[in-house]
Amino acid sequence: MSETTLNAAEQPIDELVSWVKQHDFSLNLTTERLAFLIAIAVLSNERFDEELGEGELHDAFTIVTRLFEETGEASAFRANNAINELVKQRLISRFTSEMTEGASIYRLSPLAIGITDYYVRHREFSKLRLSIQLSMVAGEMAKAIEAAKQGGTAGHWKKNVYAVLKYSVGEIFDQIDLNQRVMDEQQQSVKQQIADLLNKDWREAINNCESLLSETSNTLKELQDTLQAAGDELQTQILDIQELVYGDEELEFIEETLFGLQMKLDRITSWGQQAIDLWIGYDRHVHKFIRTAIDMDKNRIFSTRLRQSVKDYFDMPWYLTYADAERLSDLRDEALVLRDDEVTGQVPLEVEYEEFQQVNDELAERIGEMLRLHKDNGKPIDLGIVLKDYLAQHPRTHHFDLARIVIDQAVRMGYSESDYQAIQPDWQAINDYGAKVQANVIDRY
């Protein structure tokens, strides 16, 4: 990005509006014109110098017009009009020189590259692409850290630290952010596909819907794992540079740049979990819709068959056998109140509250004792061990509820220094049934 563009981006809105009006900027791309522009971009990529002659543009226009027969024939007159429209909108640049004997050559403008790049190159957002971009960012950050450790004049900081952070790291972050927005669009596209399938024939569409839902869920999970792993490393690198420039008034511009990068990194890393949470909600909504549709259709089929059977009873007599059983109810409270499988029926609210409060007080006392030992002896608290020892004393059906209470009390009464250093803790088993917890050792009271 040029300094001119940067300065324009920092101007007030009214000045930017005046700038657009002064230069008479405008865009008007019909579907046919957009297809023509994309065709030019594809042909340009196949050329070493990315330049096209007028004849090649006419050929591209002919190819596009074949698929848009309703707009007219692919005449030279219409092709020239289309080319002139793109030139007027500054989507392609026209050059004429003596070397080409007066014939014009054409190149895509930066605006056209941005438009066609979105449609051509950004339609696939994969884990591989994200991994490459994150590796590039980590490499550039390592260069900036090395230059910052060496120190030097203001020119050294601007050239070897500021420039790397502002243009290399910042632009890669912007590219990742753009790709994530493309992924958001892909999710909307998948939702539209699912809606179309369910509207046509939901019975035939169930398997296809499940495939689309699972594929998107797996993709989001892989992307989030990649973001989480790389995000911690990038966070550490940003903190390292901040520590080197902290308190130096001459390097405030470095701190401002790091602050901007921190905001971008937070947005990038939070996107993955947010996308997963939103998709889980949509997944549940689709499954609920399918279950409701199945129930409704099942009842409709049954009533139709019953009416037909009654109508044909004298021709084909039949016996009716039915079974009547009590309806099973799920008594599990959404608030995660402790269950007791030995008791059936509804527990009075006073008993539920008393049982919950008793366990809560007991846990608070146990955690408080551990924290007092830490305070007196400097002994850290391993939350995984505390959970494992405590859960071993209770039935398996209580483990999930108890673990929630233990963690809630622990985070209220202490915290881990490792959390502020962006250190990713390892997973620890907390019972014999596969449950695991990921938590740093509590070492601050």
UniProtKB/Swiss-Prot annotation:
Q: Which UniProt keywords apply?
A: Calcium, Cell cycle, Cell division, Chromosome partition, Cytoplasm, DNA condensation
Q: Which Pfam families match?
A: KicB (PF03882), MukF_C (PF17193), MukF_M (PF17192)
The answer to whether keyword Cell cycle applies is yes
Q: Subcellular localization, per the record?
A: Cytoplasm, Nucleoid
Major localisation = cytoplasm
**What SUPFAM superfamilies does the annotation carry?**
MukF C-terminal domain-like, Winged helix' DNA-binding domain
Q: Does the keyword Cytoplasm apply?
A: yes
One GO BP? chromosome segregation
Q: Which family does it belong to?
A: Belongs to the MukF family.
* Known role: Involved in chromosome condensation, segregation and cell cycle progression. May participate in facilitating chromosome segregation by condensation DNA from both sides of a centrally located replisome during cell division. Not required for mini-F plasmid partitioning. Probably acts via its interaction with MukB and MukE. Overexpression results in anucleate cells. It has a calcium binding activity.
Put simply, this protein is called Chromosome partition protein MukF
Q: Gene for this protein?
A: mukF
